[in-house]
């Protein structure tokens, strides 16, 4: 069941990022949230969520999915994060990626 939740989350992120009407206007916060969710620790994510004063049940639900994601190897999470960065580049946030993830530059040569 947890894999289904993760798959659904990733599909929703892809749909939001690549929907034609929003392609050039993707919110940098969505990109940050997505990559942070994959790569940060549970503790870092919890601190970030506290800034939004979300209901405890919502925070716990997100952390539960995070625990599922954290069962993936770091290498697998990096592959997913890099794939999402590629999608963000295609959706017009190249400047954001260059600013916050300068180490991920190998995708520029793919265009």
From Swiss-Prot:
Annotated Gene Ontology cellular components are: extracellular space
Question: SUPFAM superfamilies attached here?
Answer: Uteroglobin-like
Q: Which CDD domains does UniProt cross-reference here?
A: Secretoglobin
Signal sequence, start to end: 1-23
Question: Cross-referenced InterPro entries, in alphabetical order?
Answer: Secretoglobin, Secretoglobin_sf
Any one GO molecular function term: steroid binding
Keywords attached to this entry? Lipid-binding, Secreted, Signal, Steroid-binding
Kindly list the places in or outside the cell where this protein is found, as annotated in its UniProt entry. Secreted
Offer one Pfam family short name for this entry. Uteroglobin
What does this gene product do? Part of prostatein which is the major secretory glycoprotein of ventral prostate gland.
What more the UniProt record tells us is:
The heterodimer can bind non-polar steroids, cholesterol and a group of small proline-rich peptides.
PANTHER family tied to this protein:
SECRETOGLOBIN FAMILY 1D, SECRETOGLOBIN FAMILY 1D MEMBER 4
Q: Assembly and partners?
A: Prostatein is composed of three different peptides called C1, C2 and C3. These form covalent C1:C3 (F) and C2:C3 (S) heterodimers whose noncovalent association forms tetrameric (C1:C3/C3:C2) prostatein molecules.
Per the record, the similarity remark reads: Belongs to the secretoglobin family. Lipophilin subfamily.
Q: What is this protein called?
A: Prostatic steroid-binding protein C1
Q: Organism source for this protein?
A: Rattus norvegicus
